[in-house]
Amino acid sequence: MSVKQISIFLENKPGKMCEMTEVLAANKINMRALSLAETEGFGIVRIIVDDVYDATTVLKDAGYINKLTSVVVVELPDVPGGLNRILKVFAEDQINLDYMYALSAETSRDKA
C-alpha cells in the first residue's frame, strides 16, 4: 500500500519540534507515524497524518517548508524474523531503503 508522507524542515533548536506539532494539534491533525533525521543546523521531520491536505496547508500557512512524497507501507507479522523476511525480498529485487518507520501496534487503536 502507498501513503503520502510530509517532510518538514525545522531548525535544529530546542522547542522547534514542539512548535510544529502545536500547529498540527491546534488544527486537529493526528500524526500516525513520525521519523526525525537531524544535522547540526536543521532537521527533517517525516510524518504520516490522517489528513494530508489540511496538514500541508496549515504547515505552509505557519511558515514551514514541507514536501509531499509517496511511501510504501508494509504490514509485518509480529514474530521473530518478520522484518528480515521482507528485507530479503527487497534485497533480492535490488530495492534500496532510504529510511524506514517502525511501529509496533497494540490491538487498541486509541493508544500511541
Please state what every model-predicted region is:
Residues 1-80, 84-112:
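Structural preference for solvent-exposed beta-strand-turn elements
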